[in-house]
A protein has these predicted regions:
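Juxtamembrane intracellular "pre-TM" segments in multi-pass secondary transporters
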Residues: 4-17, 221-251
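C-terminal ends and interior cores of transmembrane alpha-helices
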Residues: 98-117
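Glycine-rich segments within core transmembrane alpha-helices of 12-TM secondary carriers
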Residues: 157-179
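Hydrophobic core of transmembrane alpha-helices in multi-pass small-molecule transporters
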Residues: 107, 118-136
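C-terminal membrane-cytosol helix-exit motif in multi-pass small-molecule transporters
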Residues: 171-184, 206-226
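Cytoplasmic helix-loop-helix junction between adjacent transmembrane helices
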Residues: 131-162
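Cytoplasmic membrane-interface "Motif A"-like loop-to-helix N-cap segments
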Residues: 87-103
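Helix-loop boundary and gating motifs at the non-cytosolic
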Residues: 6-73, 123
Length: 251
């Protein structure tokens, strides 16, 4: 309706800043979990042996996590065009973005339980966190042309990048301090205390991601398409997703 068009005029500074602020919320995942802490924590699980049996196969620990990571990107390549086709059609990018933010955040928290006894559950949380992080970015980035004029897009992206850099470094420093001085945070003053602090750092990432993304969700417009039920029946939602998938693979 013209009413909604008037409210969501492109270039609203508050909306643009709220969009950029999502980088502050999510950048803690690739830095703290992806790069700094999780690889070290994962290594501590395999002090006795580098090999583990999964589904009857003997895996080297590094190969195992690489296989799971590859599977995530394989699925993303197939599912993301499908999901963004559906989101474009229904006009509910925000719902998709929220879904992956919540799924990703809770999966980060779930990494607290990642150990050799719970290896399947741990790998599932690792998988879901990585998948959700990248999937949320797809919907996040597709918002930009809807809310920013072409001339503003570079600046808003750069603002997001700087928010993300500062936010993730703050949380990383806090977690590194906790891991290196576990006794100051109520953990044992030992290697075991540091390992426990690493697990708690996964909880902090999940909490940070979910907490700070609320500001973004509050200000981002829903951009609902006014899709009548008749139109929905005429145009299959799934077909819209598949068309997009095919066009992406043709490139």
């Amino acid at each position: 309706s013209s009413m909604t068009k008037r409210i969501f005029k492109k270039g609203n500074i508050k909306v643009l800043k709220a969009w950029a602020f999502y980088d502050w919320a999510n950048s803690v995942y690739p830095l703290v979990i992806g790069t700094a802490v999780f690889p070290i924590y994962y290594g501590t699980l395999f002090v006795d042996s580098d090999y583990i049996e999964i589904l009857g196969f003997n895996y080297k620990n590094t190969a195992l996590i690489q296989h799971v990571t590859s599977l995530v990107f394989l699925l993303l390549a197939f599912l993301v065009p499908l999901m963004s086709g559906i989101a474009d059609f229904l006009g509910n990018k925000k719902s998709f973005m929220k879904l992956f933010v919540y799924l990703g955040s809770f999966s980060c928290m779930g990494l607290y339980f990642f150990d050799l006894e719970n290896i399947y559950l741990g790998l599932l949380f690792y998988f879901l966190a990585l998948f959700s992080f990248w999937a949320s970015l797809v919907f996040y980035n597709s918002y930009l042309p809807d809310i920013a004029n072409p001339t503003e897009q570079d600046n808003v992206s750069a603002l997001g990048f700087s928010y993300g850099y500062v936010g993730s470094v703050i949380l990383l420093l806090f977690n590194l301090f906790m891991i290196n001085f576990p006794a100051s945070f109520g953990f044992e003053d030992s290697n075991q205390g540091s390992v426990e602090a690493m697990k708690v750092s996964f909880l902090t990432v999940g909490f940070w991601w979910i907490f700070f993304s609320q500001y973004t969700f509050h200000h981002l417009p829903s951009l609902k398409n006014n899709v009548s039920e008749k139109e929905l029946l005429k145009k299959s939602i799934l077909f819209s997703g598949f068309k997009k998938l095919i066009s992406v693979w043709r490139l």
